From Swiss-Prot:
Belongs to the UPF0231 family. It comes from Salmonella typhi. The lineage of its organism: Bacteria, Pseudomonadati, Pseudomonadota, Gammaproteobacteria, Enterobacterales. This is UPF0231 protein YacL. NCBIfam families: PRK05248.1-1, PRK05248.1-3. It comes from the Bacteria. The gene is yacL.
Length: 120
């Protein structure tokens, strides 16, 4: 899982992720922004579910993060879109609306994000 951290002209941190993990970047850009307490909450939840059968989730404005002891899933809240609402012959493209990654990989990105933000 490759990632890149950038700052836009206003100084806002932007996260870009490799193909298949774009939603992880969107989650950082839309949900975390400068809210490092959200990362505290996620890291605490990761410690709680690691090595157990439990899971944890947090719904945000645009994305929901879910984790169990081994993996993290981030999905766009709009994925609750019903197929019945689609016009005939149309399909809903959701490749960039859902990402799965391993817990350890995700926590490495969280740590790198914190480090990048602290270098303001």
């Amino acid at each position: 899982m490759d990632y890149e951290f950038l700052r836009d002209v206003t100084g806002r941190v932007l996260v870009r992720m490799s193909m298949g993990h774009e939603v992880v970047g969107h989650w950082f850009n839309e949900e975390v922004k400068d809210n490092l307490s959200l990362l505290d909450e996620v890291e605490q939840a990761a410690r709680t579910v690691k090595g157990s059968e439990r899971s944890w989730q947090r719904a945000g404005h645009e994305y929901t993060i879910w984790m169990d002891g081994e993996e993290v899933m981030i999905r766009a809240n709009q994925l609750d879109f019903s197929g019945d609402e689609m016009e005939e012959g149309m399909s809903y493209y959701d490749e960039e609306s859902l990402s799965l990654c391993g817990m350890e990989d995700f926590l490495r990105v969280v740590a790198a994000y914190r480090e990048f933000v602290s270098k303001a």
